[in-house]
Amino acid sequence: MSDLPRVVLFQPQIPPNTGNVARTCAATGAELHLIEPLGFSLDDRQLKRAGLDYWPWVHLHLHPGFEALRAEQQRRGGRLLALSSQADQPYHQCSFRSDDWLLFGRESDGLPPELLELAELRLTIPMAGSVRHGGGVRSLNLSVSVAVVLFEALRQLETGV
């Protein structure tokens, strides 16, 4: 496995979103860490369909809870970066590192405040149409958010992906 930022999904709920994220991770070589409980089974038909036949190339890690993920992150090193619509720092103003852990929240309500507090940095994807700016959009789709942030990190790290 190459030394790339890791994608972490906290208690994902929608199978096709996780399948799309898995496909993005397979395409980039980034590890995918899922924190339980999941809102679906890993055998879910929609999850498999969204990931197509790329599952053999997904470096998948399943954690029974956030504490298990945190222990692995601390053992392996690297920063925990939380992505949230409630954060103030735009993701593109972050200087990403190859050992970063990119933490994304649940589709329904994002990351709990206590997890946001544990992150070294809290980042957001600026949106002109967001609720914060007078629009009606609360957030982007989870799989879109992962792709936007991960590809910016890879661009900065000049991975050639």
Report the location of each language-model feature.
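Post-transcriptional modification and biogenesis factors for structured RNAs
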Residues: 1-161
